[in-house]
Every structure is written in structure tokens, then in C-alpha cells.
A protein has these predicted regions:
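Two-component histidine phosphotransfer core
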Residues: 1-168, 172, 178
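Hydrophobic core positions in the C-terminal catalytic ATP-binding module
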Residues: 109, 176, 182-190
Length: 193
């Protein structure tokens, strides 16, 4: 330690460490995105690594606002399955920003990668305010979400055409028994070859 850091209070040192951790994670995320930006497809392993960095970064920014989990079936070889680059991350971003952030008490995003038959499912499940309420909020325009979902569906359709993957996208508006929104579930399905 330098003499200057000796004179800093523990609180100031803690803030400095948080800032360094945040910038380190941010730089890793930017580097990963730039490395993958010119690629049409990447391994699911690389896509998940990007998603983990993004979620970790947002968690650092909003520590008390949301929690997250990644649950990955260890029998899936993530390095063999190719997916369109940055196909999962936008749905995690939507879950955090449009589902959970508007909730006073915050929420949780669960990312699950699992196998069913010869498919691999990537599930982004949040307990946020739901798409209907999100669209009604003044800070959110209808066209923003529909464009993002439409663009992602177009990318999946193009990837299916080029690579004959038979990937699909399903968005489920979760509701309780009273019909009130309990969040959103996005399921991306990829054929495992």
C-alpha cells in the first residue's frame, strides 16, 4: 500500500475497490461484445459468458434492486452449440430494465439452460411487472419493445434459413390466479446437433 492509501478511510477504500471491480467487469463486457460483434454466430458458452458479465455489471449498479441466478445443465456442451451472437442478453436486459426496475421492491431474474430431447432451452424468467404494465408506464413506448422482439425474431428466422437450425422464440406473460401479472418468461429453443 502507498502512504496515500494508508490515510484513506476504510469506507473510501471500499468505494475505490467497488469502482475498480465495476470498471474491470465493464471493460471485460465491452471487450467480449466487440470480439463477437462481427460474428454471425458464437458458441452458447461465449453467449452465456457475455450474459453473466452483463448481469454481474447491472447487479453491481443496482445491488439492492434485483437478484439473479444462472442454472446450467452440466450435461450440455456449451462450446459445441452455436447460437446467433447476442441473442439472449437483450432479454435479460429487458427483464431487468422493464420488468424489475419499475417494481418498488425489486425482483429476480433466473436464467436457465436445459436440455429437452434434442433441444436446448434458454429460459429468461423474471418476476417483474410484466409486459402489459411495462407498456403502460410513461417511460416506456410500445414501439421500443415490439421493435426489439421483432428484430430478434427476424434474426432467428434468418439464422434458421441459413443454418436450418429450427430455433424458436416464445414469450409468456405470467399471471396469477386473479389474472394479475407476475412477470415474463422468454424461451429460446435451439436444436442440438
Amino acid at each position: 500500500k502507498t502512504p496515500r492509501s494508508w490515510s484513506q478511510s476504510p469506507a473510501k477504500q471500499n468505494e475505490n475497490e467497488k469502482a475498480i471491480n465495476y470498471l474491470t467487469t465493464f471493460s471485460k463486457l465491452i471487450r467480449t461484445i466487440l470480439q463477437n460483434s462481427d460474428k454471425r454466430e458464437i458458441t452458447l458458452y461465449d453467449e452465456i459468458a457475455t450474459c453473466k458479465l452483463y448481469t454481474q455489471l447491472e447487479s453491481m449498479r443496482f445491488a439492492d434492486k434485483f437478484s439473479y441466478t444462472f442454472s446450467i445443465d452440466e450435461t450440455i456442451d456449451l462450446k459445441l452449440l452455436m447460437v446467433p451472437a447476442l441473442i439472449i442478453q437483450p432479454f435479460i436486459e429487458n427483464a431487468i430494465w422493464h420488468g424489475i426496475m419499475p417494481k418498488e421492491d425489486g425482483g429476480c431474474v433466473n436464467i436457465t439452460i436445459k436440455r429437452t430431447d434434442d433441444n436446448v432451452l434458454c429460459i429468461i424468467d423474471d418476476n417483474g411487472i410484466g409486459r402489459e404494465t411495462s407498456k403502460q408506464n410513461k417511460f416506456k413506448s410500445d414501439s421500443h419493445e415490439s421493435k426489439g422482439v421483432h428484430l430478434t425474431q427476424s434474426r432467428i428466422d434468418l439464422d434458421n434459413l441459413i443454418n436450418q437450425r429450427h430455433a424458436s422464440l416464445e414469450i409468456i406473460d405470467k399471471k396469477d390466479e386473479d389474472g394479475s401479472s407476475t412477470g415474463t418468461k422468454v424461451i429460446l429453443t435451439f436444436k442440438e446437433y
